[in-house]
């Protein structure tokens, strides 16, 4: 169960506007977040990524989480940026790592390997889990294609 129900709206621009509005209640921002996840596709991913500029670590953590759920490779560069940013909250970095694993795009492999020894234990452990998950997800896709 999501922390907030998605809105009954498919206008990516409007949803992005709500998601990025720092003065909006978190519940409304979360509703926009889950609506964008449900819409899917590169435009929705880009709208979600725009909110990585938020001051809220909770929101950014949820953004990374839903990007992992979406399993869209368009999210990979955005998630790599969050993971690689040593100034980012560890909760966000941890979720970015796990989302990269869930997406299963091998372009994230080198970044996950780089941060498997991160000083933040939760980030390092998340990268370790993500590496195994990435291998699993990418091998399932390869086997499915055969």
Show the residue positions of the predicted features.
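Core register positions within helices of long alpha-helical scaffolds
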Residues: 2, 35-38, 66-69, 99-102, ...
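Boundary/linker segments of alpha-helical solenoid repeat arrays
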Residues: 91, 120-129, 142
